[in-house]
UniProtKB/Swiss-Prot annotation:
InterPro entries, per the entry: 6-PGluconate_DH-like_C_sf, 6PGD_dom2, G3P_DH_NAD-dep, G3P_DH_NAD-dep_C, G3P_DH_NAD-dep_N, NAD(P)-bd_dom_sf
Gene name tied to this protein: gpsA
GO cellular component assignments: cytosol
GO biological process: carbohydrate metabolic process; glycerol-3-phosphate biosynthetic process; glycerol-3-phosphate catabolic process; glycerophospholipid metabolic process; phospholipid biosynthetic process
Protein known as: Glycerol-3-phosphate dehydrogenase [NAD(P)+]
Presence of keyword Lipid metabolism: yes
This protein's UniProt keywords: Cytoplasm, Lipid biosynthesis, Lipid metabolism, NAD, NADP, Nucleotide-binding, Oxidoreductase, Phospholipid biosynthesis, Phospholipid metabolism
Length: 325
């Protein structure tokens, strides 16, 4: 089986490295500088000391990345629709499975990644890949667990069998929507935890994570209906596991971003964002989650507080007052 990974950021490259031990992998990027750097050094600047094996073929033209059995989309959520249209223009075969490895909510439509893909590529089978997984640890082939969500059980079992390795434990789920809600919101809550980090102790930090779970459940319930909420999703690796690691580890880009915003000495969140080199998915998701909560008429005070901090320049003091009370 040939697997294509679209997106050569830290996460996409880490996935390619992780899967390349026993498989041929295509790694696609539209960034010529990244393409040339990886081709020359066989290493990503974002993943130092993590060599990229010869089993990984790096491509610059997307047409060269569609001849695969499985395509893993590890692109920023706000670029997902555009990439899917490019795949459609390449006459992507209908039997090619799409695995989503991106997290967030599309700002312009308030749709989850699977909803975007189903609009543009309705004939391709779809799965979602999510869980607690820092790119650097994945690239170093350290042990980790993930959830693969797929509504087609036969396809899901086949993908789990193909992707699971000695250091990767995959759990199969059919809860495509719930997994994505958890994956998107945890980045917003990580920013919130970064804001309070250093100002208060571990007790307040734990309370904030606990309240975050309540907001995840609220949006999850609004999307699927109260009777369809799966407790295994909420307590599994893709929700509780991912939330805990993203909200507590300094390797978390969103947590670090929240801390920088809280200690910015007057710089706006947009200024801090522009100075960084990494994608902060929680920044975009904060607005999308706030807008979606308004649309669905549910209360999400943590998301609202982070949205107002990032987009309306609410003071840190007022934001923290909401987060800790």
């Amino acid at each position: 089986m040939v697997i294509s990974v679209l997106g050569a950021g830290a996460w996409g490259t880490a996935i390619a490295i992780s899967l390349s031990g026993k498989k041929n992998v295509i790694l696609w990027t539209r960034n010529k500088a990244i393409f040339e750097s990886i081709k020359e050094k066989r290493e990503s600047d974002k993943l130092p000391d993590c060599p990229i094996s010869d089993n990984v073929s790096v491509k610059l033209a997307i047409e060269d990345a569609v001849n695969a059995s499985v395509i893993i989309l590890a692109v920023p959520t706000q670029s997902l629709r555009e990439i899917c249209h490019q795949l459609n223009d390449c006459n992507l075969k209908k039997n090619v499975a799409i695995i989503l490895a991106c997290k967030g909510i599309e700002k312009s439509t308030l749709k989850l990644p699977s909803e975007v893909v189903n609009e543009v590529l309705p004939n391709n089978p779809l799965a979602v890949f999510s869980g607690p997984s820092f790119a650097i640890e994945v690239a170093r082939k350290l042990p980790y667990s993930m959830v693969l969500a797929c509504q087609n059980e036969v396809l899901g079992l086949k993908l789990v069998s193909e992707l699971q390795q000695e250091n990767i434990k995959l759990y199969l789920s059919s809860d495509v929507i719930g997994i994505q809600v958890c994956a998107a919101l945890k980045n917003v809550f990580a920013i919130a935890c970064g804001v309070v980090l250093g100002r208060f102790g571990f007790n307040a930090h734990a309370a904030l994570i606990t309240k975050s779970m309540s907001e995840i459940k609220a949006l999850y319930s609004a999307k699927v209906g109260d009777g369809n909420v799966d407790i295994n999703t909420l307590l599994g690796p893709a929700c509780l596991g991912d939330l805990v690691v993203t909200c507590t580890s300094l390797n978390s880009r969103n947590l670090s971003f929240g801390s920088k915003v809280a200690n910015s000495n007057g710089s706006s969140a947009q200024q801090i964002l522009s100075e960084g080199k990494s994608v902060i998915e929680g920044f975009n998701t904060a607005k999308s989650a706030f807008d979606l909560a308004e649309k669905l008429k549910i209360k999400m005070p943590i998301c609202e507080a982070i949205y107002r901090l990032l987009y309306e320049n609410t003071s840190i003091e007022d934001t923290i007052s909401v987060l800790v009370n």
